[in-house]
Amino acid sequence: MTDRYILAVESSCDETSVAILKNESTLLSNVIASQVESHKRFGGVVPEVASRHHVEVITTCFEDALQEAGISASDLSAVAVTYGPGLVGALLVGLAAAKAFAWANHLPLIPVNHMAGHLMAAREQEPLVYPLIALLVSGGHTELVYVPEPGDYHIIGETRDDAVGEAYDKVGRVMGLTYPAGREIDQLAHKGQDTYHFPRAMITEDHLEFSFSGLKSAFINLHHNAKQKGNELILEDLCASFQAAVLDILLAKTKKALSRYPAKMLVVAGGVAANQGLRDRLAQEITHIEVVIPKLRLCGDNAGMIALAAAIEYDKQHFANMSLNAKPSLAFDQFPDSFVIN
């Protein structure tokens, strides 16, 4: 059997990445050019800055990914690219590069949903068992997804306001922590105690929706009031209390989803899946079903996860033509207008 190689491109936010996947789940390379240092002084991602950085480094990422994988363009079977959701300018840079490369090398183009990529990152460490439920937690999304079979995604719950990663970054900014703040808050939380009371929005309600805006506002109000009154707050305890509230919400909704849908596996993915507190709680509280979390290097945005998701679409011969466009608000159940089934 001839080996299959997929080159994948990811540029939906502030990471420029190109990866090479061999067959179903072997990543030969996963080159990531991070922009974190450029955005730190702004306390968040500036779309125009992100787009310009993508343009500067994407060609080098292509070259490095192929060199690291030890193959040439003539060995490739397909090109995959994130076409949404994400920042429109950032998406267009990766999309233009992927389309040009695919056209020049006469390769089929596979459109990949960024969040499907996060979910399918778990495929690298072991085969996924269906049906499964996925908890996707990142800076832009918080979703519960039911996946009855490969490539078939159904959102069963999502945030009504802030994404969980967004809440981490916003409270981190209030505390004067470095962007992105999630890792530092997690580390501080492990040194503190849950002593401050924060709301757990909708935690007892019957639906599977999330809300983090009230928690974020309560945290900011507590911090500002204490500062105005000259009261000292213990940073470690603040982080521990905030994180305890976040994890209570995530675990409660995930358990409800598992009780309502026939699932053989739980996948937890996205940037916030790197959170050690979340990993610890999952290990302690969800023991009746296998929990799969991608390795730390695949939790953040990267093209490796896009390639792993693309392998599913390749098997189904789901390709797009060169009119494929960026979809910044792409939903899980939305297919590209240029979708072609061969």
From Swiss-Prot:
It comes from the Bacteria. Its cofactor is Fe(2+). Keywords: Acyltransferase, Cytoplasm, Iron, Metal-binding, Transferase, tRNA processing. Pfam families: TsaD (PF00814). Fe cation binds at residues 114, 118, 301. Substrate binds at residues 136-140, 169, 182, 186, 275. The keyword Metal-binding applies. GO terms for cellular component: cytoplasm. It is found in: Cytoplasm. Gene3D superfamilies: 3.30.420.40. The keyword Glycoprotein does not apply. InterPro entries: ATPase_NBD, Gcp-like_dom, KAE1/TsaD, TsaD. Belongs to the KAE1 / TsaD family. Required for the formation of a threonylcarbamoyl group on adenosine at position 37 (t(6)A37) in tRNAs that read codons beginning with adenine. Is involved in the transfer of the threonylcarbamoyl moiety of threonylcarbamoyl-AMP (TC-AMP) to the N6 group of A37, together with TsaE and TsaB. TsaD likely plays a direct catalytic role in this reaction. This is tRNA N6-adenosine threonylcarbamoyltransferase. It comes from Streptococcus pyogenes serotype M6 (strain ATCC BAA-946 / MGAS10394). The gene is tsaD.
